[in-house]
Amino acid sequence: MVENVKELLKLHEGITHEVYLDNENSSIVPEEIVDEMLPYFNKKAYGNPTLTHKPGWEAFEVIMKCFGKVSQTLGAKNLEDITFTPGETEANNLAIMGACFAQKDIGKKIVISEIEPINVLQVAEMMEKFGFSMQKVPVNSEGFVDLEKLKEAVDSETALVCISAVNNEVGTVQPLKEAVDIVKAKNPKALFQTDASDAYGRIPFDVQKLGVDLATVSSYKILGPRGMGAMYLREGINLERILEGQIGTQKLWPGVENTPLIVGFTKASELAFQNFDANVAKMRALRDKLVDGIFKELDDLRWNGPKGDRRSPDNANISILRAEGEALTIELSLKGVYISSGSACSRRLLQPSHVLVAIGRRFSEAHGSILMKTTRHMTEEDIDYVLKVFPSAVNRIRGIVGSTGVD
């Protein structure tokens, strides 16, 4: 495997222009965020925030400020409502498992949308080992949750409902407030959790206005460092801790806090919301230019998900018929354009995206899907370069597919 990777990297030598559009699975951290983080590794606030000495007190002060700043961006009431975790996946594990264990005397039913992210879906499935049942709520062809089916699914045994604010693959902006109201009217004791990683920094999102009990977000999806996320827990809601160990500044996540990454995440959140409207407008304009250019140059394409304001401004998911998404990803990589074929979580299993299957895409359409996400740091020149190399890459892959008789 290592040798194969070395050979693949050699093929990329000589690339002069690179455009990173795989912002679903990672992101390039801007220099201003890196610069903000660096001193906290070895020059200041490098102590354990629970210890009684200067470096510890410095770390405590910094982390408390970060709690406050991130809580404000989410619309949380208190800084104590926020728990920093080593990523979105860990935050979802804490939210779902912690809520289920705390709610087990109320009920043992979990209701989720059928297009939840893999890290939500798998945790919910895992809870079946502890006696919980799971019911999936269907979506329509654009990925919107069927609210009538949601109402039918929630009953007196429902402990937790999980619906992402924005779908990570097709960008569907769910009517979250309406969904929360339906759940609470049917069962006031049921908790409502939302993975807001693809809403955070892209659409207006306020936990208090929405009425959610739990929300999770990711650092790298707002151009912060990987390995950092956060969970919001509404004041007055009980959650069981799922990991044991030394308790620092957070009662729900043990261990020594990672001050540099917390600082980086906080700086990323500040920048994402500092010029929110302008950032969103730029992401949308670049995305629209990219999509319009692709559809102008190529035929046999399928747009996956909704359009307009009902979709996340950065998200573009296209099924390219007579082409295989993974092959196109490699072909574009050789030209310095980096995208994702569907969901990275599904790709390693060589299975079509469960999201695309749920919205009615055929097997070939799902396997021919690609996912691209723009950021506020991209330029018009970046999109121009992508549009320059994209059609020839697709035509080359289609030629290979056609010659092999694969469809």
Model-derived features: positions:
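Pyridoxal 5′-phosphate
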Residues: 1-407
